[in-house]
Amino acid sequence: MNKPICSTGLRWLWLAVVVVILDISSKQWVMAHFALYESVPLIPFFNLTYAQNFGAAFSFLADKSGWQRWFFAGIAIGISVVLMVMMYRSTAKQRLINCAYALIIGGALGNLYDRLVHGAVNDFLDFYINNWHFPTFNLADVAICIGAALVIFEGFLSPVEKNAVNNDE
């Protein structure tokens, strides 16, 4: 039996749309205003640095022959579909987990757009301490990490705490 979308976790997909819009817009701005590998210091531990990543997190598999572009695109699509099915099976009142899934979906689709349109993921957030730089990342990566952290957090909640977090009152 079909249930109304508004009563399912899919009601929270608007958050994924917001993530995709913010991610793509921020990357477009960086690509329009920066040359590749150009870096602009903003504060003592943070630069905007335009970089491209042909792999996954921490440039995993970036040095391969190009097959990884399609491999990671397939993973992004697969994860997004699985999470949307999970959202459909949940209720709209399960806010925490559905927001977590929406953040992950939005991040995955933002990076998927880059892979399909640009052939690589465009990164620009560059945090560092002295001469050590954390791998450059983007807003999609931030959304994925926050979403994953929320999934883990939700897993530690007791059933009573889950009801309190998801209570509409």
UniProtKB/Swiss-Prot annotation:
The active site is at residues 123, 141. Coiled coil: none annotated. GO terms for biological process: proteolysis. PROSITE patterns: SPASE_II (PS00855). Pathway: Protein modification; lipoprotein biosynthesis (signal peptide cleavage). Pfam families: Peptidase_A8. It is found in: Cell inner membrane. It is a multi-pass membrane protein. It is an enzyme of class 3 (hydrolase). GO terms for cellular component: plasma membrane. InterPro entries: Peptidase_A8. The keyword Repeat does not apply. It comes from the Bacteria. It catalyses: Release of signal peptides from bacterial membrane prolipoproteins. Hydrolyzes -Xaa-Yaa-Zaa-|-(S,diacylglyceryl)Cys-, in which Xaa is hydrophobic (preferably Leu), and Yaa (Ala or Ser) and Zaa (Gly or Ala) have small, neutral side chains. Keywords: Aspartyl protease, Cell inner membrane, Cell membrane, Hydrolase, Membrane, Protease, Transmembrane, Transmembrane helix. One of its GO terms (molecular function) is endopeptidase activity. The keyword Membrane applies. The chain crosses the membrane at residues 4-24, 29-49, 70-90, 101-121, 137-157. Its EC number is 3.4.23.36. PANTHER family: LIPOPROTEIN SIGNAL PEPTIDASE (PTHR33695:SF1). This protein specifically catalyzes the removal of signal peptides from prolipoproteins. HAMAP family: LspA. Belongs to the peptidase A8 family. This is Lipoprotein signal peptidase. It comes from Yersinia pestis. The lineage of its organism: Bacteria, Pseudomonadati, Pseudomonadota, Gammaproteobacteria, Enterobacterales. The gene is lspA.
